[in-house]
């Protein structure tokens, strides 16, 4: 069996320990490595000729990307998970206890268990390469750093900085890592090993004291001050998580116990808390999303089809969506883009949009002004069809007007090559209708982005009956290069995300008309786990947009999509939401930092907000509509699998990740229980709550999706 760790001795007395997991592109830590590392460390201890040790990766662009997550699924009990954490503690403690200097030479991803390994070394040096990132992202999987990270990190960089890293899972760039004291030096990759060897030869050195702000010095220097930090962090966590995620509170407790009662106690608490989190339903759900998205990245979207290379893209429309799509195409995908708009104003808007986003990177020192300018040079503009002939893909982001989109299809078929893909960013029009104007319908596809484009991770790739597999595969690959998570859905009104969202939003609007207050409704759904409430979302998306989509869905899918009368009343009062500063909430100079409801909206709707119902009951009534419709979408073949439905809902509308997505959540609730809830509402409120056939069958058979 090939070994992962290879020890070589140099003439100057420095030993190089190279980690290279056989057959994998990245290094990850596995349980079976424990005995192998312990054996090597015993060998080093017994060899008096070794004066220092350098730990380095044999992989091209990865130090250690973290622990192998699949190990956790093998843990049947909390005891198994605790043993895993304790094994890590033993190995890392042995490494730290070596009397010779130990230096970690870091290039590429140094995350999770990888950073914990580096923290157990006496010094760290990293490359200045853009691929080098350091962090502890375990919280994003509902976990905490279980290899001593909650103890070593605060002792190295300070409590406040360590908590910020662990509670957000943020990744740190080399310069920032040096500034915060996470690494001792940053050098070009070409001299990384040489520098690490020189550091080992120079011997152990006490870490330089981290430069802390005066406030942090005062707070972290006394037990009273430290308690303020922990209490403040706890309050912020409770506000952000609404009590739905157990990991952040446990991270704070690990640090608190370790600082007040010593490292040994801290490690004991870390192992116990880690074990509890591994077997928690929240972490299980978050890990399922991680595995699903990882699995999805290996798929082309169309079985047996390979994507064509996209060397140039054209965006039609320089508005908010067009500007955002052009921006992610140049900055993330590094693909040259030609933006076409009928007006110079639209073009200057698109350029300004892209520049503003890139300039943020310069201001945050993530990129140089020269790098920003090079990326901006990839974007060119035109008011006519010039410089578009060689486009591999054209993304249309114009007004939702079928005749206009038909004209665009004809223009592109005339001006571009026979293989050029025409991808429409429509949010409501069926792609088959847009393709009716095409002589090459196999090249027509939907590519539905969500606003704001640079922040929302999901795109829906919509295939109509005649879309070719190669067009699907190429569009999926293009979206991935833009940093997006694409799901392939079949053509149909509302596609998947807007279809399940519409019923949820309609139900919230119905509750509003029944006298529930705006803020109570929003708070109820935020407490349930959504990032924003449905009424806030309606203001952000645009009340006019919601009103436009509803009739299309009702016409194609039936009366259950009939929108409450609220939309017409609001539009009659020229309330479109944030975009025109007039919606459910106050905007503009008069609005305070904490959003206030525009109380006059109740008069427009002809209602008086009355007694607020139980928040759980409100959330349930909105959410069960979404769950029922998600299953209908699966039945109708709109989505290919429950997995795709979960990813679409989480990344497209912020369905609570800790629930794992609509289909995972239905499994948790039980189909029979969901059918009972839906039938209860059906008897009170009408046929829009009727459970779909598949749910009824699953309830009878006690079946699950996963």
Curated annotation (Swiss-Prot):
The catalytic activity of this protein is classed by the Enzyme Commission as 4.2.1.17, 5.1.2.3, 1.1.1.35
Return the annotated site residues (Important for catalytic activity).
116, 138
Q: Does the keyword Lipid metabolism apply?
A: yes
Top-level taxon in the UniProt lineage: Bacteria
Main location class = cytoplasm
Q: Which reaction does it catalyse?
A: a (3S)-3-hydroxyacyl-CoA = a (2E)-enoyl-CoA + H2O; a 4-saturated-(3S)-3-hydroxyacyl-CoA = a (3E)-enoyl-CoA + H2O; a (3S)-3-hydroxyacyl-CoA + NAD(+) = a 3-oxoacyl-CoA + NADH + H(+); (3S)-3-hydroxybutanoyl-CoA = (3R)-3-hydroxybutanoyl-CoA
Q: What does this protein do?
A: Catalyzes the formation of a hydroxyacyl-CoA by addition of water on enoyl-CoA. Also exhibits 3-hydroxyacyl-CoA epimerase and 3-hydroxyacyl-CoA dehydrogenase activities.
Q: Which HAMAP family match?
A: FadJ
The name of this protein is Fatty acid oxidation complex subunit alpha
Organism, scientific name: Shewanella baltica (strain OS155 / ATCC BAA-1091)
Q: Which gene is transcribed and translated to give this protein?
A: fadJ
């Amino acid at each position: 069996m090939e070994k992962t760790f290879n020890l070589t001795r140099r003439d100057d007395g420095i030993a190089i320990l190279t980690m290279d997991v056989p057959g994998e592109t990245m290094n990850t830590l596995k349980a079976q490595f424990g005995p192998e590392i312990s054996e090597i460390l015993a060998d080093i201890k017994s060899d008096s000729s070794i004066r220092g040790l350098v730990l380095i990766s044999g992989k091209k662009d990865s130090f250690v990307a973290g622990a192998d997550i699949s190990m956790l699924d093998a843990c049947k009990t909390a005891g198994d998970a605790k043993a895993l954490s304790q094994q890590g503690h033993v190995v890392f403690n042995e490494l730290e206890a070596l009397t010779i200097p130990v230096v970690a030479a870091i290039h590429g991803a140094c995350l999770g268990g990888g950073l914990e390994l580096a923290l157990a070394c006496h010094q760290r040096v990293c490359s200045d390469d853009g691929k080098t990132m350091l962090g502890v992202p375990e919280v994003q999987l509902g976990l905490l750093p279980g290899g001593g990270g909650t103890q070593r990190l605060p002792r190295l960089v300070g409590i406040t900085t360590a908590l910020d890293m662990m509670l957000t899972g943020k990744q740190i760039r080399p310069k920032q890592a040096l500034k915060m004291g996470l690494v001792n030096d940053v050098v070009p990759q070409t001299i990384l090993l040489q520098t690490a060897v020189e550091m080992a030869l120079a011997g152990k050195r006490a870490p330089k004291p981290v430069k802390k702000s005066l406030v942090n010095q005062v707070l972290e220097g006394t037990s009273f001050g430290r308690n303020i930090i922990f209490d403040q962090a706890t309050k912020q966590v409770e506000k952000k998580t609404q009590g739905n995620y157990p990991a952040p509170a446990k991270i704070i407790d690990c640090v608190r116990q370790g600082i007040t009662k010593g490292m040994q106690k801290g490690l004991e608490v870390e192992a116990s808390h880690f074990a509890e989190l591994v077997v928690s339903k929240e972490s299980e759900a978050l890990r399922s999303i991680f595995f699903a998205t990882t699995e999805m990245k290996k798929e082309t979207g169309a079985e047996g089809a390979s994507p064509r290379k996209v060397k140039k893209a054209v965006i039609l429309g320089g508005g908010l969506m067009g500007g955002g799509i052009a921006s992610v195409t140049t900055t993330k995908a590094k693909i040259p883009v030609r933006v076409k708009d009928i007006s110079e104003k639209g073009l200057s808007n698109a350029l300004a949009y892209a520049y503003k986003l890139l300039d943020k990177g310069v201001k945050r020192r993530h990129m140089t002004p020269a790098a920003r300018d090079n990326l901006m040079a990839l974007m060119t503009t035109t008011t006519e069809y010039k410089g578009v002939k060689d486009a591999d893909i054209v993304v249309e982001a114009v007004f939702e007007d079928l005749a206009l989109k038909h004209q665009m299809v004809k223009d592109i078929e005339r001006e571009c090559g026979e293989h050029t893909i025409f991808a429409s960013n429509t949010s409501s029009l069926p792609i088959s209708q847009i393709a009716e104007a095409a002589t090459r319908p196999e090249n027509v596809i939907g590519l539905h982005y969500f606003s704001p484009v640079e922040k929302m991770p999901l795109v829906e790739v919509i295939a109509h009956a005649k879309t070719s597999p190669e067009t699907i595969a190429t569009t999926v690959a293009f979206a991935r290069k833009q940093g997006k998570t694409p799901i392939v859905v079949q053509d149909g009104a509302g596609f998947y995300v807007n279809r399940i969202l519409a019923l949820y939003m309609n139900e919230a609007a119905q509750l509003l008309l029944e006298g529930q207050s705006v803020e109570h409704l929003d708070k109820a759904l935020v407490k349930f786990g959504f990032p924003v409430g449905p009424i806030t979302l309606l203001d952000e998306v645009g009340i006019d947009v919601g009103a436009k989509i509803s009739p299309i869905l009702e016409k194609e899918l039936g009366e259950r999509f009939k929108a409450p009368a609220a939309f017409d009343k609001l539009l009659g009062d020229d309330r479109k939401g944030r975009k025109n500063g007039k919606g459910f909430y106050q905007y503009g100079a008069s609005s305070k930092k904490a959003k206030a409801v525009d109380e006059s909206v109740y008069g427009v709707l002809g209602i008086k907000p009355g007694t607020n119902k139980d928040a759980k009951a409100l959330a349930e009534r909105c959410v069960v509509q979404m769950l029922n419709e998600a299953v209908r979408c699966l039945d109708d073949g709109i989505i290919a699998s429950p997995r795709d439905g979960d990813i679409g809902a989480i990344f497209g509308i912020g369905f609570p990740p800790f629930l794992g997505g609509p289909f995972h959540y239905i499994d948790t609730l039980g189909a029979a229980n969901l059918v009972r809830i839906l039938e209860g509402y059906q008897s009170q409120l009408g046929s829009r709550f009727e459970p779909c056939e598949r749910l009824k069958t699953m309830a009878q058979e006690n079946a699950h999706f996963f």
